[in-house]
């Protein structure tokens, strides 16, 4: 078994998500460790949270805000934010974000108030 995996995020099919469109690398049932997402936020995202997942956002393009438990944080390229389980969050503004998710993304762990 190979001890590495390779993905080309710009060639990965986009899927709708609460933040806009997400291209998900390493998203498969046998992978429980981590996933990497390229997220294009074209409008204000829907507030949501995760009970198990920790997300780390790296802003690649655009400027705007991340709302984290009701606090509005200004972000710009290379701003990096770790979002722990239970933190209600959403992006506000048009941005491209690299999102590292640990453990691997689980669509059943997206919660809305």
What feature does the model see in each segment?
Residues 43-45, 79, 87, 95:
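Surface-exposed loop/turn positions
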Residues 70-86:
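Short acidic-glycine-tyrosine-enriched beta hairpin
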Residues 50-52, 93-94:
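Short glycine/proline-enriched turns and hinge-like loops at secondary-structure junctions
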Residues 1-35:
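A short, N-terminal "cap"/entry segment at the start of jelly-roll beta-barrel domains
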Residues 52-64, 69:
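Glycine- and acidic-residue-biased ligand/ion/polar-headgroup-sensing regions
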Residues 35-51:
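Conserved short histidine dyad/triad with adjacent acidic residue
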């Amino acid at each position: 078994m190979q001890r590495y995996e390779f993905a080309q995020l710009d060639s990965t099919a986009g899927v709708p998500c609460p933040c806009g469109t997400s291209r998900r690398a390493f998203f498969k049932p046998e992978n429980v460790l981590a996933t990497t997402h390229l997220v294009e936020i074209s409008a204000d995202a829907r507030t949501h949270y995760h009970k198990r997942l920790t997300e780390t956002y790296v802003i690649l393009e655009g400027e705007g805000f991340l709302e984290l438990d009701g606090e509005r944080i200004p972000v710009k390229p290379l701003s990096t934010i770790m979002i722990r389980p239970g933190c209600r969050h959403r992006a506000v503004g048009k941005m491209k974000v690299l999102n590292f998710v640990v453990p691997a993304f689980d669509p059943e762990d997206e919660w809305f108030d």
